[in-house]
UniProtKB/Swiss-Prot annotation:
Binding site for [2Fe-2S] cluster: 328
EC identifiers of the protein: 2.8.1.7
Catalytic activity: (sulfur carrier)-H + L-cysteine = (sulfur carrier)-SH + L-alanine
Pathway the protein contributes to: Cofactor biosynthesis; iron-sulfur cluster biosynthesis
UniProt name for this protein: Cysteine desulfurase IscS
Keyword Iron-sulfur set for record: yes
Residues reported to bind pyridoxal 5'-phosphate: 73-74, 155, 183, 203-205, 241
Pfam families listed in its UniProt record: Aminotran_5 (PF00266)
Length: 387
């Protein structure tokens, strides 16, 4: 079988073998419903508690009860935005939300929905580096602002937003602060207390855990109307039978993610830089966004004169997986929203290719990718009508 190279780790990651190993007994032997009073149910409780302990410590929350299990970050994001709508907009008359133009569709689409209900949403523009400033947030906040929602790291460029500065402003103004940390956890340190975060969303499958499980950090003392109603699971905050094997897997994945942070910075970051520097030697290739303030695994490359989709499928034929942007929107074949937001032409914005590494990538894989990418760029430009 030909070697396959996976460089789409911002879309999803492979499960770490250690995560699979710790999940297996709960898929096979310890399958009881945790809410049941018999031993099949109660024997799962220690493992759930241990997993929650790993999760809250992984983001430096104060208490184990500050982390609520969800199905994914999309659910977590929806819960925060819609919960704030009920708690702040309807009950207190605060009908304003501040976010950015480059948020994940799970946030943007939910904000669009809330706008249809009469909520005013300010979408902060990004600068030429792909970022915003804390001052922009400060200027956007009004007496009617209920929530500020800004992602910790961008899913396409990897750029890190000034979360600590924004958190300090929100705390000073008495405004709730939410961050989608899906692309930050496992790549850089995430500290909810230091950042003054009220809500933080994450998904296990982005840091080598299973798909279909995620979480929401809710700062102690902050209320949030439940998105789901039913049983009294998670202290009545999120109904639904607890998915024990996936919770156990997510806890272990978080623990391993924190343990590998130095490796991400020193090894994965150097592999990304090697890949990037080699691709920049190809004529008319550029890196999109700030190359300094970003997570260590991600690069967004623009290859002038070549449609991103054409490059994507050429790489795919050589068994290399990459992306043109968010996996939740990439099938639409739209211009890259980050490139559009920084002012690139739609023609140029269609040339984006995202390459995102993980701790399981090797230097040999990067060398092979450089070779294949360079050959593909030459071949595709030879048949391009726009280069």
């Amino acid at each position: 079988m030909l070697q396959r190279i996976y460089l789409d780790n911002n879309a999803t990651t492979r499960i770490d073998p250690k995560v699979k190993e710790i999940m297996d007994p709960f898929l096979r032997d310890h399958y009881g419903n945790p809410s049941s009073l018999h031993q099949f149910g109660t024997e799962t409780h220690p493992a759930i508690a241990e997993a929650l302990d790993k999760l809250y410590k992984g983001i430096n929350a104060r208490d184990i009860d500050d982390v609520i299990i969800t199905s994914c970050a999309t659910e977590s994001n929806n819960w925060v935005l819609k919960g704030v709508y009920f708690d702040e907009c309807l009950k207190k008359g605060k009908n304003h939300i501040v976010t950015t133009v480059t948020e994940h569709p799970a946030v943007r689409s939910t904000c669009n929905f809330l706008e249809s209900l009469g909520v005013e949403v300010t979408y902060l523009p990004i600068n030429e580096h792909g970022s915003i400033t804390a001052e922009q947030v400060k200027e956007a906040i009004t007496e009617k602002t209920a929530l500020v929602s800004v992602m910790w790291a961008n899913n396409e460029t990897g750029l890190i937003f000034p979360i600590e500065e924004i958190g300090a402003i929100c705390k000073e103004k008495g405004v709730l602060f939410h961050t989608d940390a899906v692309q930050a956890i496992g790549k850089i340190p995430v500290d909810v207390l230091k950042a003054n975060v009220d809500f933080l969303s994450f998904s296990a499958h982005k840091f080598h855990g299973p798909k279909g499980i995620g979480g929401l950090y809710i700062r102690s003392g902050v209320g949030l109307t439940p998105l789901f109603h039913g049983g009294e699971h998670m202290n009545g905050r999120r109904s639904g039978t607890l998915n024990v094997p996936y919770i156990v897997g997510m806890g272990e994945a978080m623990k391993l993610a924190v343990e590998h942070l130095d490796y991400e910075k020193e090894v994965v970051g150097k592999l990304r830089d090697k890949l990037e520097e080699a691709l920049l030697k190809i004529p008319d290739v550029m890196v999109v966004g700030d190359r300094i303030h970003r997570v260590p695994n991600t690069t967004l490359i623009s290859v002038r004169g070549i449609e991103g989709e054409a490059m994507l499928w050429d790489l795919n034929r050589s068994n290399i997986a990459a992306s043109t942007g968010s996996a939740c929107a990439s099938e639409d074949l739209e211009a890259n929203p980050v490139m559009v937001a920084i002012g690139a032409s739609k023609e140029l914005a269609h040339t984006a290719i995202r390459l995102s590494l993980s701790r399981f990538n090797t230097e040999a894989e990067i060398d092979k990718t450089i070779e294949v990418f360079s050959q593909a760029a030459t071949r595709l430009r030879n048949i391009s009508s726009s280069y």
